[in-house]
């Protein structure tokens, strides 16, 4: 930016299809290259996200991701993958607030899996058949930035979905208080030395401060 006068941003690419496509081509050209799901359908972990089977503890994942995602200047997100919707809007609000108060990453989602029956509509969680009529359903999950029926995903994203550990909010443990938490101790202000001068009226005026 200083050299050319142009503006640049650092962005986490979504890679809805390239996570599989590039891994497949790389594996064909370089058989020894490391990809996710060694020995099977290859894919790359999206952007700088954790491996999809890393942990069921959402706060353990956030502890790692918060250090990375705050380095981006645009286009980054942490997806809180849930097996099914939370029991109430109050539960969702409490989780959103806890993340906001204790982490600094700019954007996150609550992403439950759900199913749709053509006869009976919305079903929570992954239910491949309708418990009421027995018809085959469509299971929806967030492929990356948007929801789509899992049956329409490419082979790599389908494998990722199979290996994905969904976060268990009930057993997740927050191990620290972040800077915005109400009980967090405020950082001590640095000692400041004021540089003063007198203006034409004789009043003192602060020119600048320094530590």
Regions found by a protein language model. Give the residues of each.
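Long, C-terminal-biased catalytic regions of enzyme "large/alpha" subunits
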Residues: 1-186, 193-211
């Amino acid at each position: 930016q200083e050299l050319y006068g142009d503006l640049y941003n650092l962005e986490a690419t979504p890679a809805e299809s390239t996570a599989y496509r590039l891994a497949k081509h790389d594996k064909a050209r370089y058989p020894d290259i490391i990809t996710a799901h060694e020995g099977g359908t290859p894919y790359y972990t999206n952007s700088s996200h954790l491996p999809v089977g890393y942990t069921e503890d959402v706060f353990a994942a956030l502890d790692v991701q918060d250090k990375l995602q705050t380095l981006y200047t645009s286009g980054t997100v942490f997806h809180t993958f849930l097996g099914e919707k939370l029991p109430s809007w109050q539960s969702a609000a409490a989780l959103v607030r806890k993340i906001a108060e204790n982490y600094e990453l700019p954007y996150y989602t609550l992403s439950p899996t759900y199913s749709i029956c053509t006869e009976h509509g919305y079903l929570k969680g992954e239910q491949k058949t309708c418990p009421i009529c027995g018809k085959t359903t469509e299971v929806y999950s967030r492929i990356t930035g948007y929801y789509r029926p899992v049956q329409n995903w490419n082979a790599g994203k389908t494998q990722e979905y199979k290996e994905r550990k969904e976060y268990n909010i009930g057993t997740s443990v927050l191990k620290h208080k972040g800077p915005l938490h109400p009980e967090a101790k405020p950082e001590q202000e640095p000692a400041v030395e004021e540089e003063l001068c007198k203006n034409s009226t004789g009043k003192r005026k602060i020119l600048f401060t320094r530590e």
